[in-house]
Curated annotation (Swiss-Prot):
Enzyme nomenclature, EC number: 2.2.1.9
GO molecular function, one term: manganese ion binding
Magnesium as UniProt keyword: yes
Keywords attached to this entry: Magnesium, Manganese, Menaquinone biosynthesis, Metal-binding, Thiamine pyrophosphate, Transferase
Cofactor, free-text remark: Binds 1 thiamine pyrophosphate per subunit.
Domain of life: Bacteria
Annotated pathway: Quinol/quinone metabolism; 1,4-dihydroxy-2-naphthoate biosynthesis; 1,4-dihydroxy-2-naphthoate from chorismate: step 2/7; Quinol/quinone metabolism; menaquinone biosynthesis
Record protein name field: 2-succinyl-5-enolpyruvyl-6-hydroxy-3-cyclohexene-1-carboxylate synthase
Function: Catalyzes the thiamine diphosphate-dependent decarboxylation of 2-oxoglutarate and the subsequent addition of the resulting succinic semialdehyde-thiamine pyrophosphate anion to isochorismate to yield 2-succinyl-5-enolpyruvyl-6-hydroxy-3-cyclohexene-1-carboxylate (SEPHCHC).
Catalytic activity reported: isochorismate + 2-oxoglutarate + H(+) = 5-enolpyruvoyl-6-hydroxy-2-succinyl-cyclohex-3-ene-1-carboxylate + CO2
Annotated family: Belongs to the TPP enzyme family. MenD subfamily.
Biological process terms in GO annotation: menaquinone biosynthetic process
Amino acid sequence: MTVSTFNRTWAKVIVNALLRYGVKHFCIAPGSRSTPLTLEALQLQQNQQAQCHSHFDERGLGFFALGIAKVTNDPVAIIVTSGTAVANLYPAIIEASLTHHKLIVLSADRPPELIGCGANQAIPQQGIFADYPIAGVNLPKPAEHYNAGWLVATIEQACVTQSQQGGVVHINAPFAEPLYEADENAINTHPWLKPIQSWLINPQTKWINSQTIQSEVSMHENWDYWRTKRGVIVVGKLPVEQGIGIKAWAETLGWCLITDVQSCVDANLPYADIWLSNNTVHQRLLQADIVIQFGGQIVSKRVNKFLEAFKGEFWQVDEYSDYLNPFAHHQTRFVAKAHHFLRVHPPLRQKPWLLEPLALSQFCAGFIEQQVGGSLNEASLAHHIEEVLATSGNLFIGNSLFVRLVDALCKLPEGYPVYTNRGASGIDGLIATMAGVAKGSGQPTVGVIGDISALHDLNSVSLLNKISHPCILFVINNSGGAIFDMLPVEAQAKEQFYRLSHNYEFAPIATMFGIEYIRPFTWADLKAKLKLAYGRKGVTIVEIKVNDQDGSNLYKSLVKQISQAEIA
């Protein structure tokens, strides 16, 4: 068998192993060295066993794969060629690692004899992602003296680890030339495949049958005591299904419930980032005996300040064993899904122990509405974000100022899917991630990002052309990084090295990539144009042009005024 043919046979085993562990999407960047992997992934697509997606920019491709992984909860494979193509995946790998979303990187490589000798496009790729992957496999150059069962077992063991822990797997696969003109008939019939033939012909068969014994969460030995005390529940980022029941549980206990915009839990105390600025309410909330936090990645600065200041009994509930303790609490940790924790900790019905947060939250609702006003700007879009969402769809929120405005100013529908990149909270790859969420879900998706984030990920606008159902990408153009207006930095330095003000507009970008574009000036204009946008296939870019400091100034003003409100 020729080298090119055996390369394909070897790659066939790799991609078929991934199928057994739920991979349904292969995201492929162009490249020659990865040809065996690419062609075998395409064979799976031809057999209707997987979908293949392509993009010319590996950084965007990684985030596109991450978006698909977020919305499907399935592992997503990424195929790239050798060299810096691999390194361009790093930001997405970091984000996926921190949020436990499942990515499998298949990086093609030069064979070992071409590493470290000046050969073209050859860099050391083993361990290139440091400790971020939960499993790394550095395969040898394809050779018949390696048992086919060994290759299957090696790939599957990495997938087993991922299925238990989430996160990223990196499989580095060297291929020697020639890479083309394989004998298509011989790829599937080589005697080397005989030991795994029954495995190959049955896509449901796994080489490694691993059964994870799930340890059930047990009721805390002192729960009967703590459920009679004064409590606060803080809900961070959670999958939709885990948030079900938390609100009713909190109401039965009579405890204060503070929810993050990523929690998918209906807030009975919305606008916490605003009302917690009031020191009187903040101090009274600190009188709680116990705080239970579900999930992590809290957006609100003032909620985090409350958590930092609290010195009582602290419980942390999260399905992963990550160390989520930025304030070094003396804590009790439950490695459990939120709804499993609720099931074994029945509430005791009590009256609410603290009414001031509810009163101030209700006051904030009207006060925010009054202060935001009727103009179309980033603050009013954040406050009324529900009005631009599809009934059944997704919301993807970028980072920097807008996610803080949404967290502080809006009240989302119970259980509405919200996606973010808050693992490392970077601004890179946001358009690509939103495109992945839209593509993976097949549902109308609204994304909202800032202008600097959009400029940072312009290449990924081309990914929006892959979406055939109605989706909306809002670009909030405040002529620079408005989040930095919050910083106490000298004006000239802030302008030149933080805000990076510009005069760019996004209509020419939409034209270049063939994307529908609108720029509304009023809410009536926006709603009329959104009705048309939801009625056609594909993505519409909506640019909201605002004064550079309006959003940050309103945010600071709301915080200041509520902080000074007198509470009886």
